[in-house]
Amino acid sequence: MSEAGGAGPGGCGAGAGAGAGPGALPPQPAALPPAPPQGSPCAAAAGGSGACGPATAVAAAGTAEGPGGGGSARIAVKKAQLRSAPRAKKLEKLGVYSACKAEESCKCNGWKNPNPSPTPPRADLQQIIVSLTESCRSCSHALAAHVSHLENVSEEEMNRLLGIVLDVEYLFTCVHKEEDADTKQVYFYLFKLLRKSILQRGKPVVEGSLEKKPPFEKPSIEQGVNNFVQYKFSHLPAKERQTIVELAKMFLNRINYWHLEAPSQRRLRSPNDDISGYKENYTRWLCYCNVPQFCDSLPRYETTQVFGRTLLRSVFTVMRRQLLEQARQEKDKLPLEKRTLILTHFPKFLSMLEEEVYSQNSPIWDQDFLSASSRTSQLGIQTVINPPPVAGTISYNSTSSSLEQPNAGSSSPACKASSGLEANPGEKRKMTDSHVLEEAKKPRVMGDIPMELINEVMSTITDPAAMLGPETNFLSAHSARDEAARLEERRGVIEFHVVGNSLNQKPNKKILMWLVGLQNVFSHQLPRMPKEYITRLVFDPKHKTLALIKDGRVIGGICFRMFPSQGFTEIVFCAVTSNEQVKGYGTHLMNHLKEYHIKHDILNFLTYADEYAIGYFKKQGFSKEIKIPKTKYVGYIKDYEGATLMGCELNPRIPYTEFSVIIKKQKEIIKKLIERKQAQIRKVYPGLSCFKDGVRQIPIESIPGIRETGWKPSGKEKSKEPRDPDQLYSTLKSILQQVKSHQSAWPFMEPVKRTEAPGYYEVIRFPMDLKTMSERLKNRYYVSKKLFMADLQRVFTNCKEYNPPESEYYKCANILEKFFFSKIKEAGLIDK
């Protein structure tokens, strides 16, 4: 090794580019630092031929195995050994990375042992402690001159620096062994960053032109998957829902230990993809998620908590294919209960999730999904994943299947400090036991139903043993039209497939048989339609048909043509064979078609219905009032003489195939809540007799006992709600701006951070803050003053519910609340 500064980890200059971030990585050097000489600590750190960098610890990019599990274990052992060494040995180690301070003119930036150890190093020689008077082979000054700044450093700080030293040496090996240019460049940047932090005795912070800090996208992958479970499976019974939650945990766990392929490999596989965007995420992933698994002196983040939809889209297809292939290969190694979960349920789960990942209008990626579905999420849907400490080491059991969930290991002291899980004594927001005891005394927002009551009602209506009354083995007389069909689909009696003819590839025999079956069903059920016309459209490549299959044969279908550029789909034929009608198949068929179109971002149906079909289409939400402009569809759809044009607008937030189940459950909840309220009000009033005397209507407040139920009349406001939306918007904007500018508004400007307020989101079920209100106002969410006032009132109520009355936050809430009410009175929104 050259003895000039900048040759190796002991003498590599850390000044140039050390402060640059991963987005502005220093150019890859023409000649990387050469291999360390005999006796250099790098040789010992490499640990023989088994050492490798995080990205090179796997054979192929994209594997699901956590890279370098053995490497991280070796590093942990070496750190433990070094931290238990005598102080003199520690000083020798740190001296290698410390600039000489004997003279200002001395440029030596790392002490070099004049008597290097042999290669490979012998165990008996490793324990020899060098004297502080030993001269440096490079500058001839004593070791003490290199470590004079460490004389009064505590053992804890010295151990921290030694941990960084071993991480530097590990990254030095990575730089030399890595073949991919992009990955090598990131390793080199991190190597210099850690090297600089040793020289300056600071904490390494990744920074630079990638100004964005974690999280890089909201909502995160973890939140998106959690939203997906709530969106698609909240209606399921608790046992089935728990299965979905387990699948979600498994999926998130695999992403956290998934190894991303290098940008160069991705460029070869997908030349048309956005490589620059992927490279940016890959760099962030290396710096914040991958390398910190092994170099714990760097702050570590979970991939699923700091990345969002963009990264998930870039890896999902490959990841899904490899996970399922891996599951098939290792099915014999899996326990029986895991085998069913992974081989049967996991593929379906991934398919449904894939549709939401790539859909443009999927609600699971909306920022306000949680606030919009907060009540649904509380009905038994638990958080999909309980986040482990942000920094931690993961151990894999080599004897178990690689699809088993890894166990979270222990965090190092440095990691615990950065994880934010331990409350500091000086934290302002502190939850005390006395506060919990006083919870019942706190005011609550009007209309909120206690979660204990909701959970109790849910446990009653979902537990057959808790429901009173006779057992029934058949569908209720009031069950939804599609309930029988939905149950048959779950049992596998019926199936739904979108099929169509193709000019590009030869359809398989099964699809051709189904197309012929569809032609026959439409011909029999639509006798006034020419058979040749039906055949032409069914086999037209521009048309598709949602086929209903039972016992392997077609019993119904909906033929349609999509016009993506116009934003609508034309329904051409819709029929179910006569002997299979009145079973709910028609409704369930249409609901599947609606969900199919939501996934393809087409939210309008148009159809010409004859006199016999109008009733059916009305039941499916169609109307004679067409919502889309006439210019969009004139000249595109087929006009039928004597038929009525009908349209249907789809709501992308509604899971149509499960909609009736959700409505039914909501009705059951309301019914049970009413029954409980009735049980609390013991007084029975006689019925109203006024209607017998010809009275057509009476004021609600005149009904005997109505006030005892908790009903309150709405006060007659002198100044009515502004009818003009723009006028209301301007008024609310002015009020909100004045509230935000108030000197007591500072605690409420941003959403409460979990690290600042432990347990806040377990106490406060419906959080609100001024930033969220500003975004809602900007998006025209507040269509009435009541919505606006309810949100701002919730800000104050939440604060008072969480914080004790003597706290500064509580006092700020009282002051700001009075100010707010004075402003809405001035604006004439309430009576003065």
Swiss-Prot record:
Regulation of protein activity: Activated in vitro by very low concentrations of spermidine, but inhibited at spermidine concentrations higher than 4 uM. The activating effect of low spermidine concentrations may be mediated by N(8)-acetylspermidine produced by KAT2B/P/CAF itself acting as a positive feedback loop.
Q: What is the effect of changing Y760A?
A: Reduced acetyl-lysine binding
Record InterPro entries: Acyl_CoA_acyltransferase, Bromodomain, Bromodomain-like_sf, Bromodomain_CS, GCN5, GCN5/PCAF, GNAT_dom, PCAF_N
Any signal peptide, and if so, which residues?
none
Question: Keyword Acyltransferase: yes or no?
Answer: yes
Tissues in which the UniProt entry reports expression: Ubiquitously expressed but most abundant in heart and skeletal muscle. Also expressed in the skin, in keratinocytes (at protein level).
Kindly give the PROSITE patterns that the UniProt entry links to this protein.
Answer: BROMODOMAIN_1 (PS00633), BROMODOMAIN_2 (PS50014), GNAT (PS51186)
Where along the chain is composition biased (Gly residues)?
A: 1-22
GO molecular function terms attached to this record: acetyltransferase activity; chromatin binding; cyclin-dependent protein serine/threonine kinase inhibitor activity; diamine N-acetyltransferase activity; DNA-binding transcription factor binding; enzyme activator activity; histone acetyltransferase activity; histone acetyltransferase binding
* Residues that hold acetyl-CoA according to the record: C574, A575, V576, Q581, V582, K583, G584, Y585, G586, T587, Y612, A613, I614, G615
One Pfam assignment: Bromodomain
Entry EC no(s): 2.3.1.48, 2.3.1.57
Q: Where is the composition biased (Basic and acidic residues)?
A: 425-436, 714-725
Which reaction does this chain catalyze? L-lysyl-[histone] + acetyl-CoA = N(6)-acetyl-L-lysyl-[histone] + CoA + H(+); L-lysyl-[protein] + acetyl-CoA = N(6)-acetyl-L-lysyl-[protein] + CoA + H(+); spermidine + acetyl-CoA = N(8)-acetylspermidine + CoA + H(+)
> Which top EC class applies here?
transferase
Active-site residue numbers: E570 (proton donor/acceptor)
Q: Locate the N-acetyltransferase domain: which residues? A: 503-651
Compartments reported by the entry? Nucleus; Cytoplasm, Cytoskeleton, Microtubule organizing center, Centrosome; Cytoplasm
Q: Where is the Bromo domain?
A: 723-827
- What is written about domains in the entry's comments? (Microbial infection) The bromodomain mediates binding to HIV-1 Tat.
Q: Which family does it belong to?
A: Belongs to the acetyltransferase family. GCN5 subfamily.
Q: How does it assemble?
A: Interacts with SIRT1. Interacts (unsumoylated form) with NR2C1; the interaction promotes transactivation activity. Interacts with EP300, CREBBP and DDX17. Interacts with NCOA1 and NCOA3. Component of a large chromatin remodeling complex, at least composed of MYSM1, KAT2B/PCAF, RBM10 and KIF11/TRIP5. Interacts with NR2C2 (hypophosphorylated and unsumoylated form); the interaction promotes the transactivation activity of NR2C2. Interacts with KLF1; the interaction does not acetylate KLF1 and there is no enhancement of its transactivational activity. Interacts with NFE4. Interacts with MECOM. (Microbial infection) Interacts with and acetylates HIV-1 Tat.
- Its name, as the record gives it, is Histone acetyltransferase KAT2B
What species is this protein from? Homo sapiens (Human)
